[in-house]
Amino acid sequence: MNTPKVNILHAPGQAAQLSRALISTCHTRPLLLAGSRVATSLHPTQTNLSSPSPRNFSTTSVTRLKDFFPAKETAYIRQTPPAWPHHGWTEEEMTSVVPEHRKPETVGDWLAWKLVRICRWATDIATGIRPEQQVDKHHPTTATSADKPLTEAQWLVRFIFLESIAGVPGMVAGMLRHLHSLRRLKRDNGWIETLLEESYNERMHLLTFMKMCEPGLLMKTLILGAQGVFFNAMFLSYLISPKITHRFVGYLEEEAVHTYTRCIREIEEGHLPKWSDEKFEIPEMAVRYWRMPEGKRTMKDLIHYIRADEAVHRGVNHTLSNLDQKEDPNPFVSDYKEGEGGRRPVNPALKPTGFERAEVIG
């Protein structure tokens, strides 16, 4: 039995050039992009049309990736459902999400914003984004057009790198607030659960993309280093100033919304033909987690769901940054009074700059 071929991609400095080669040729020649093995199958051959197509994209031989996290077979357990089931999104909610930026108002806001810009710069380098693929630097969080689009391979590398560290802030904040609650012998007023759920949701984004892309040694090394630095930085930052840290995460989620919005635009404009192909299948775990209906399971639909999640994190963290970090309850899980001016906050995905304290606490 022949071993299936897998396209190999790494070397971030040559990402754009090598990714172009991936699209323009029909060869299974090894390519390198940030240490990732990307499964690529766009048009199945005539002999394979009758068999189920794999969740990948290749133009020559059918490529299959090993399952990085197969379910462990046990004598009694059939499956383990998500600890936090996703509530799902309506199409109107998803299409209403737009990139937006909250202007810094304090020194802490300004510091958080500048740190995010540094992170964006480092991520662009790590994932091989070339100057001609950059958006307008005067409007980096809202501009979504560039002189040259990214390729599918570049997008997957970028998604995996971003999502591998995006799950860190919620876990760090939830852990520290949990320990703080134990030390003070006081309730946390609903913050911990929201923060941990955010971290869990980001991890599901990562696992979904890993079903389409196998990280190579270089990518794993970059992720290991980035996560180690980011975890410790978030840990110290949250101990010093939770308010600034939540603002930082809010700005970070603005970048995430911008990233996925640009990807959606490039799919719609036909720059990513493999993801526009009707035969392309998204991972089954994504269909189950987001409860995606029949007829709404394209790559574009998947990115819409993930972008809506990121928009929620954006609104939640900007709101939490506006609150009293020690005393205020979490407005997104609280029951509100009726008839006394109190009002439940609307979907945070639709409030890009977050709610001010007076709007949700009084």
UniProtKB/Swiss-Prot annotation:
Domain of life: Eukaryota
Keywords: Disulfide bond, Electron transport, Iron, Membrane, Metal-binding, Mitochondrion, Mitochondrion inner membrane, Oxidoreductase, Respiratory chain, Transit peptide, Transmembrane, Transmembrane helix, Transport
UniProt EC number: 1.-.-.-
Major place of residence: mitochondrion
Binding sites annotated in the UniProt record for Fe cation 2: E202, E253, E310, H313
Residue ranges that the Swiss-Prot or TrEMBL entry lists as coiled coil: none
CDD domains per record: AOX
Subunit organization: Homodimer; disulfide-linked.
Name this protein carries in UniProt: Alternative oxidase, mitochondrial
Gene: aod-1
